[in-house]
Amino acid sequence: MALTKPDVDVLVVGGGLGGLSTALFLARRGARVLLVERHASTSVLPKAAGQNPRTMELFRFGGVADEILATDDIRGAQGDFTIKVVERVGGRVLHSFAESFEELVGATEQCTPMPWALAPQDRVEPVLVAHAAKHGAEIRFATELTSFQAGDDGVTARLRDLGTGAESTVSARYLVAADGPRSAIRESLGITRHGHGTLAHFMGVIFEADLTAVVPPGSTGWYYLQHPDFTGTFGPTDRPNRHTFYVATTPERGERPEDYTPQRCTELIRLAVDAPGLVPDILDIQAWDMAAYIADRWREGPVLLVGDAAKVTPPTGGMGGNTAIGDGFDVAWKLAAVLRGEAGERLLDSYGAERSLVSRLVVDESLAIYAQRMAPHLLGSVPEERGTAQVVLGFRYRSTAVAAEDDDPEPTEDPRRPSGRPGFRAPHVWIEQDGTRRSTVELFGDCWVLLAAPEGGAWPGRPPAPPRIWASASTSISSAAMSPPPPAN
């Protein structure tokens, strides 16, 4: 197959958080992007809610952070926050993991310029679509991939418009598979997965009801329910009086999704919030499986996996969607570097090496949290919890693209005491640049960065000629001078 002039640089299949983030970050770097999504629109359900500080740093690079914060800033809009294991909402507390927002974020506040946010997926996705399109990405909903052929020169794909039935062919240098946990693209390539597999089965219910007597106004939280009659979770959404309720099911005992009628779900919700007379408005009921998988390969020629297509993460800890966005950022800058001629194809191999390490940390952390809060029988058989700060901000990349030191095998560090060693995230330090106070973290994201001490001379403000290895590339370098803090009084 010879693709002399592909229709697009990158074809992204799947319009969830991972796919849309990939499209946005690629388009901002000038790549020609086409994203197709078989659903008719962005998510109509809250799904993954919450953005950790690393995700907000990436959203700052993508130019969408302010809109996400305006959509739902947990500090300003949500009031207090709690995470507890309870028999029922408002009932006996079996264990408390966070009594306040300050307790929840205290371990990360000094490590990052960005706050946590609690925007739900159905609010985030339209923002990503709008900004990706603004930068030139083409987004096609109600369009599915029916087949593709991959070769050394790229990909040829067949697409079907689900509204009209019309089929078309598109050629691309690269294909990003963001088509979810049951990824047809991954399976067609014969890419296997490893992990704990299916952990539990749930029915997810979205409903509306006035629960101010149970959850006071100005307070929000996530409750893990250990009711005598069932196990589940209860949580808020960003809309007044709208809530989520998940109840564990037992298909091995013959239970079926259709057994969970609106009437039965109403009875369970009444038990969960201890309100026998409550009449909730049931908006949606869906079956859902909790699982933990990681793909054995993240790249096959011109095809790269992103998000749930590459790994499936238990939702405990709220890191699955955040990790998908991180995948999108990492694969996008590497694809853009190759497309621009700044790097060779081997750079793409580092994507899977780096992101699979992060995914292992995230899956292990999520499993540890799941065992603590919902499945104590798993304690001792899953890794111990490292802590959100280390997993979110203290992870380390190891790959052929990182000139890493091999003197420390640990995959994380405490971001409150950053080492600055290769492979770790850039430490957060407040600096003054052109009269503006900003974080060192904000210097990264769009181009190569050189940090120079005051004795760096002519470097700050006048980027040097690229080293010889980049001589043939159109490479942009940002530089900044670092001054020591003033002496203490």
Swiss-Prot record:
Chemical reaction(s) catalysed: aklavinone + NADPH + O2 + H(+) = epsilon-rhodomycinone + NADP(+) + H2O
GO process annotations (BP): antibiotic biosynthetic process
Signal peptide from the UniProt entry: none
Positions bound to FAD: L17, G18, E37, Q121, L145, D308
Keyword GTP-binding: no
Region described as Disordered: spans on this chain: 402-428, 455-489
Pfam families documented for this protein: FAD_binding_3 (PF01494)
EC number(s) from the headed UniProt entry: 1.14.13.180
Any one GO molecular function term: oxidoreductase activity, acting on paired donors, with incorporation or reduction of molecular oxygen, NAD(P)H as one donor, and incorporation of one atom of oxygen
Residues at which aklavinone binds: G317
Active site per the UniProt annotation: Y224
Pathway: Antibiotic biosynthesis; daunorubicin biosynthesis; Antibiotic biosynthesis; carminomycin biosynthesis; Antibiotic biosynthesis; rhodomycin biosynthesis
Keywords, sorted A to Z: Antibiotic biosynthesis, FAD, Flavoprotein, NAD, NADP, Nucleotide-binding, Oxidoreductase
Obligatory cofactor(s): FAD
Biased composition (Low complexity): 468-482
Subunit description: Monomer.
NCBIfam families reported for this sequence: AkvoneHdxseDnrF, AkvoneHdxseRdmE
Known function: Involved in the biosynthesis of the anthracyclines carminomycin, rhodomycin and daunorubicin (daunomycin) which are aromatic polyketide antibiotics that exhibit high cytotoxicity and are widely applied in the chemotherapy of a variety of cancers. It can also hydroxylate 11-deoxycarminomycinone and can use both NAD or NADP.
Family per similarity comment: Belongs to the PheA/TfdB FAD monooxygenase family.
Protein name as it appears in the record: Aklavinone 12-hydroxylase DnrF
Originating species: Streptomyces peucetius
Gene: dnrF
